[in-house]
């Protein structure tokens, strides 16, 4: 990033290189080339195109490279000064120098002369400095002279500012013209006369900025004012002068309505305060208006610059004026300060600069508008494309829905037809059964009419039917009892499986024996009924006796196993009671231990206070956080102990009823909403533990716990831990 001073130095350096011929711009009379754009080396420009290229890059705010910007600014200034196309001047009777009065060769000039497009003249207006100006072609035709081909010259009031011999950017670096010509050189007056100009040049001591040749007054920009003859006091200790601060002077000027931005008193390292101050009014036109008011105020009060220069005894008067060209080039502290802080600009030059910036801004906005329009067109095309795709997809969706509806209607019709066919088959089966019933009734009636040959056969037939019916009923009843007993035994087996795994084989044998006994009893009953119907049958009798003996043996075995099972159950109950007593004693003993170990006592259903403290610190001040946490924890302890509140629901999964937490409970939802997920998790965990270990009373139950594996600890683990702890704490025997 270059400073303004560095950019000016770079611009002057490149300008000097083009001026010395180091860098070539002009290729031919009509073709030019940019010496700095290496990408476009082979591209040739017309004069106006290259000038537009240089001004576009040099004046654009988008140019990031300061060196490139300085190059093109130097190119633009060089082209405007030296390369504008020109032609040889045509002779005109009105450009005769001898016909002009003698007064125009001496003193200050009062007007500026412009010739035809073939000529080049040196003119000034209200200045002693000559300016080399490129004249614009302006032919004026009368009623008859234009037709005859005679040409007349038209004089313009102002010279072209772009071809002034003065440069506003580097006044300190340009060589000054001397008042006399060197020996052997052709005088400037003769050069001007040879081109048809009528003037007697006077050589300036320094070059001024662009815009000075058109007669405009040059001001220091940013607009500056000068205060002179300010009060100062001499300090005996420091042997220097002192004065008021810039802020106090600024406040006084603001009260008078001048609105300066800053006031800078000028100091000298040897003498101290010089009595002068620079008033900064800014760069805008409002600052120029304030500076003009400032100048008029002191001028009306006869305290302007002219009054300050003419008076010999200023007294206590405060003088002030606007900083202009002579102040800028003065060899005083004022001139040094102005040259460091600003440059010279005329009002017309400032207006031209603002117009150029406005034109650049408008062009940038136009480019942005074109870009936005292109983007809008792209978005419109994308929108149209998306709309067409969406419309196509909607049509496909409608077609899919119609196809689905048609398939559903076909499936429904097929289902209705299938149900109708089933109904028809059912009707046919019913009719067939009804026909069979009628057939049997007719057969029975036929048998009744025909009368059986003998009553014995009829009674035997009836008895056989009754016997078969009774046997079937008894068999069904035995099967039902057997199934019911099997289901009961299966349930008992499932309940006792976890506690008495060592008795499973015996229980299975007992169940098998009991089933065999029941089956044999059923067989005995069936045989008894069959014996009653058929009379005395030795084979059946033997089978009955044999079955009774086997049944008796089975019953004796069953009674033995039943007594053995009862004995084991009683022993298991005693053992279980002893284990529970031992577990309770172990829990009581481990409660007294204060050390934190992996085996200990956990209060199942206890509410963790840590989440409550965390939430209280976030929602309440630090002073009230602990108290609020205790209140919230106590409140939810009461809710957990309330038996009327039952946020547990029973859910049946795979035929098994399970208890689960009802997350839709109002209290739990309110808890989650107000206190967050951590408190909700702590409360639900305590609720699940209380429901598991003490669902009826829902109070805290101590339990032996393995904290390392987060599970319920066995009695063996607790005893081993106590023994190891006792061994560690047991005092070692003293050595003799």
From Swiss-Prot:
GO terms for biological process: gene silencing by siRNA-directed DNA methylation; methylation. InterPro entries: FDM1-5/IDN2, FDM1-5/IDN2_XH, XS_domain, XS_domain_sf, Znf-XS_domain. Keywords: Coiled coil, Methyltransferase, RNA-mediated gene silencing, Transferase. One of its GO terms (molecular function) is methyltransferase activity. Residues 80-90, 144-167 have a biased composition (Basic and acidic residues). Residues 80-167 are annotated as: Disordered. The keyword ATP-binding does not apply. Residues 360-597 form a coiled coil. It holds the Pfam family XH. Acts in association with FDM3 and FDM5 for RNA-directed DNA methylation (RdDM). This is Factor of DNA methylation 4.
């Amino acid at each position: 990033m270059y400073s303004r001073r560095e950019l000016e130095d770079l611009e002057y350096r490149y300008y000097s290189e083009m001026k010395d011929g180091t860098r070539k711009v002009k290729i031919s009379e009509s073709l030019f080339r940019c010496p700095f754009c290496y990408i476009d080396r082979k591209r040739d420009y017309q004069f106006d195109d290259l000038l537009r290229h240089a001004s576009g890059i040099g004046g654009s705010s988008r140019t990031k490279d300061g060196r490139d910007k300085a190059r093109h600014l130097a190119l633009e200034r060089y082209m405007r000064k030296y390369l504008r196309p020109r032609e040889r001047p045509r002779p005109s009777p009105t450009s005769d120098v001898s016909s002009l009065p003698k007064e125009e060769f001496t003193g200050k000039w009062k007007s500026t002369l412009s010739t035809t497009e073939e000529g080049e003249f040196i003119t000034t207006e209200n200045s002693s400095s000559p300016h080399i100006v490129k004249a614009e072609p302006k032919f004026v035709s009368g009623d008859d002279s234009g037709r005859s081909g005679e040409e007349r010259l038209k004089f313009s009031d102002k010279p072209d500012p772009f071809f002034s011999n003065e440069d506003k950017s580097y006044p300190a670096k340009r060589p000054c013209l001397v008042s006399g010509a060197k020996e052997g050189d052709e005088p400037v007056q003769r050069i001007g006369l040879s081109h048809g100009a009528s003037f007697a040049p006077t050589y300036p001591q320094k070059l001024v900025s662009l815009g000075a040749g058109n007669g405009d007054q040059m001001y220091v920009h940013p607009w500056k004012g000068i205060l002179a003859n300010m009060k100062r006091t001499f300090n005996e200790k420091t042997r220097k002068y002192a004065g008021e601060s810039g802020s106090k002077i600024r406040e006084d000027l603001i009260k008078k309505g001048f609105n300066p931005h800053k006031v800078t008193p000028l100091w000298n390292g040897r003498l101290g305060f010089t009595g002068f101050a620079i008033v900064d009014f800014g760069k805008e036109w409002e600052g120029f208006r304030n500076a003009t008011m400032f100048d008029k105020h002191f001028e009306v009060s006869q305290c302007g610059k002219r009054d300050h220069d003419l008076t010999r005894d200023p007294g206590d008067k405060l003088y002030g004026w606007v900083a202009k060209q002579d102040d800028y080039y003065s060899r005083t502290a004022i001139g040094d300060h102005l040259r460091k802080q600003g440059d010279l600009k005329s009002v017309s030059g400032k207006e031209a600069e603002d117009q150029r910036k406005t034109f650049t801004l408008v062009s940038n906005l136009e480019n942005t508008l074109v870009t936005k329009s292109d983007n809008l067109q792209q978005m419109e095309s994308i929108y149209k494309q998306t709309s067409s795709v969406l419309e196509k997809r909607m049509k496909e969706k409608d077609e899919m829905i119609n196809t689905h509806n048609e398939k559903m209607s076909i499936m429904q019709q097929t289902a209705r037809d299938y149900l109708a066919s089933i109904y028809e088959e059912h009707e046919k089966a019913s009719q067939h059964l009804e026909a069979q019933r009628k057939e049997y009734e007719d057969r029975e009636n036929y048998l009744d009419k025909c009368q059986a040959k003998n009553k014995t056969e009829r009674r035997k037939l009836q008895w056989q039917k009754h016997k078969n019916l009774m046997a079937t009923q008894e068999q069904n009843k035995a099967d039902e009892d057997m199934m019911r007993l099997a289901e009961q035994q299966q349930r008992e087996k499932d309940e006792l499986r976890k506690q008495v795994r060592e008795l499973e084989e015996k229980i299975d044998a007992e169940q098998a024996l009991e089933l065999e006994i029941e089956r044999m009893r059923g067989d005995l009953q069936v045989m008894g009924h069959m014996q009653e119907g058929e009379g005395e049958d030795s084979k059946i009798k033997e089978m009955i006796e044999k079955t009774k003996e086997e049944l008796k043996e089975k019953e004796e075995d069953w009674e033995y196993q039943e007594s053995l099972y009862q004995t084991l159950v009683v022993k298991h109950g005693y053992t279980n009671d002893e284990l529970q007593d031992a577990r309770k004693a172990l829990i009581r003993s481990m409660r007294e231990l204060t050390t934190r170990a992996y085996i200990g006592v956990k209060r199942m259903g206890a509410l963790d206070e840590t989440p409550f403290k965390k939430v209280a610190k976030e929602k309440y001040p630090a002073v009230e956080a602990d108290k609020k946490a205790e209140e919230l924890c106590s409140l939810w302890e009461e809710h957990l102990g309330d038996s009327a509140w039952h946020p547990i629901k029973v859910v049946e999964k795979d035929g098994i009823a399970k208890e689960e937490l009802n997350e839709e409970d109002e209290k739990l939802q309110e808890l989650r909403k107000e206190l967050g997920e951590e408190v909700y998790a702590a409360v639900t965990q305590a609720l699940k533990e209380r429901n598991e270990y003490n669902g009826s009373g829902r109070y805290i139950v101590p339990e032996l716990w393995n904290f390392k594996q987060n599970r319920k600890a066995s009695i063996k683990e607790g005893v081993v831990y106590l023994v190891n702890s006792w061994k560690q704490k047991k005092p070692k025997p003293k050595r003799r």
